[in-house]
């Protein structure tokens, strides 16, 4: 490559030194120690507690969603669409599976899953709902799914490459929530 100097003469550009891709040997050596930490290695860094807090808030969201879907399943059973009431149960079970996966990841990161019923609704991103009419139930569940989608999308962006295992978990859950939202949107349109 060349460039013109002030006098207009062409001069070669100096080569820019770039850092080569290389593994962090110190971190690899550190991984040989602290075996009681299991999968936790130094790369988790200072944000591990923040990730645990985000996961605990998502755990609360999933548990509130389980409770809302279960209530809607049982109270919608006598309403216009038994098929939708049954689907509420399917969604409740999916949300329970999400909660289990989140709790498991919290433990893997060295945290404790917070199942405290006293703080669930305060920590949850989504609201509990006691609607009596099927259409209102569908709408409440769609709102909750959309809130969860936004929360998971933001968490995935925040975590980035800091914790690829947690990011993949959240991406899997996000895909399920997006599917739930599409189903609810279709039922509302009927």
Describe the residue ranges of each PLM region.
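Iron-associated oxidoreductase/ferritin-like identity signal
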Residues: 1-190
């Amino acid at each position: 490559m060349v460039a013109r100097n002030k006098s207009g003469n062409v001069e070669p550009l100096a080569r820019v030194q770039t850092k080569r891709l290389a593994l962090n040997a110190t971190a690899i050596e550190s991984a040989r120690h602290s075996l009681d930490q299991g999968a936790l290695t130094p790369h988790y860094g200072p944000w591990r507690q923040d990730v645990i807090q985000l996961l605990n808030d998502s755990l609360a969201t999933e548990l509130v969603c389980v409770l809302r879907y279960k209530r809607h399943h049982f109270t919608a059973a006598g309403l216009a669409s038994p098929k939708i009431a049954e689907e509420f149960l399917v969604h409740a079970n999916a949300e329970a599976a999400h909660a289990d996966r989140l709790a498991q990841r919290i433990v893997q990161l060295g945290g404790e899953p917070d199942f405290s019923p006293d703080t669930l609704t305060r920590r949850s991103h989504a609201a509990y709902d006691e609607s009596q009419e099927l259409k209102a139930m569908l709408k409440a569940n769609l709102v909750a799914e959309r809130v969860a989608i936004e929360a998971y999308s933001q968490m995935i962006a925040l975590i980035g490459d800091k914790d690829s295992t947690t990011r993949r978990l959240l991406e899997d859950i996000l895909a399920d929530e997006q599917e739930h939202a599409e189903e609810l949107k279709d039922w509302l349109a009927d």
